[in-house]
Amino acid sequence: MLDKAKSIQDQLSVWRRDFHMHPELGFRETRTAAKVAEILEQFGVRLRRGVGRTGVVADLGSGKPLIAIRADMDALPLQETNQVPYASQNPGVMHACGHDGHWPWRLVRRLCYPAKNFPGRCDSCSSLLKK
């Protein structure tokens, strides 16, 4: 499984940097949610869009018990001053606390550690479900 995670490391970096370059404030994560949904759908994941406005819920497995794994995707109203190629392109908004990495980590979990060995259901959901 570690080998599989390493094999997609470069793609995960591309996704995280894309999320970092295009941060969106809470309840406005339309681009981020669309991108997350697009990636999940490419891997055949059943999902629900627009949960709590811009949330995404990925359904993995079936039955009971149900485990929900939440991943934040909102950014903060801060100006990024980092001088990196993937700096925020949205003035006054940036990912300053790691939320740009939460969904790529969830994607690693989905792609490298399938829910097939789990006797129930595992949902990955966005931060809107806590609000």
Task: State the predicted function of each range.
Residues 107:
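Cytochrome P450 heme-iron axial ligand motif
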Residues 2-95, 104, 112-123:
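Acidic/His- and Gly-rich active-site-bordering loop/insert found
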Residues 73, 126-131:
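Acidic, glycine-rich active-site loops and adjacent beta-strand->loop/helix elements
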